[in-house]
Amino acid sequence: LDGTIYQQNRPIKFADKFISYLQKEGREFVFFTNSPEKSPLELKLKLSGFNIDVSEKQIITSGQVAIDYLLCHNKNCTVFVIGTNQLKNDFSNSGFNVVDSKSKKADYVVCGFSRSVDFSDIESACRYIWNGAKLICTNFDESIPCENGLTPHTGAINASIEYATGEKAIMLGKPGSYTFEFLQNRLNAQKQELCVIGDRIDIDMLFGKLNGIKSFLVYTGITSEAEALDPKNHGFFDAGFKNLKQLMDFDKELCQGPKPHYVFSAVPKESV
């Protein structure tokens, strides 16, 4: 999303035309963000403001992946969630018993992201883990871009909990395999039918490489063309493009036979 479809609160040129092209061609695609901060509905409304009309089901967050993981592994568990009220409500609405800092015990600590996280949240998370809770992290992004450079993100919060407790988190989000399997099931596709589009080599393109799918890099976000051409980054992606129009033209020429499904992938950025 951010860096691929829009830059914070501004649409990226050709994004709406590219999505319209995919829709007219009958292509299946989803948007995935590593940030658990906003709900699919909030992101759908944001996209609609950029003339991009998609359903909530086409937008997936790392928070949803965390919920799916627990539904598959321990759907009757109690959880302590570090994150926004929206994320806590999502867990509660999915049937989990979400506890606050006053409870005596939790089965899992879910480390998400919120700009209002404070010491008491981290202290409570550590206490639950010392008492036997397992740690899950929605995404390991230690920092994300913002208007003033960088700002800490989920990975930084998680690192403090890991350091204090010695407990290693179960890593979800990109570039993990569980997230890939979740997206693959959502699209009901084989690996050879999938490709990922993103703007960051160390997360988006690595996601494709580790999970064995084609990866297309666009130079509209984090990674510049010069960085992409650096020899150290060779082998991390299949092709690079200046913008989505160039990718669209490439797709028109390439796809005379079976056409791939797309996963639009992006590192989260600070919301303005």
PLM features per residue range, with description:
Residues G3:
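Receiver (REC) domain active-site loop signature in two-component systems and cognate sites
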Residues Y6-K13, K17, Y21-R27, K38-I60, ...:
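Asp-based, Mg2+/Mn2+-dependent phosphohydrolase catalytic module
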Residues S35:
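Conserved phosphate/oxyanion-binding catalytic-loop motifs
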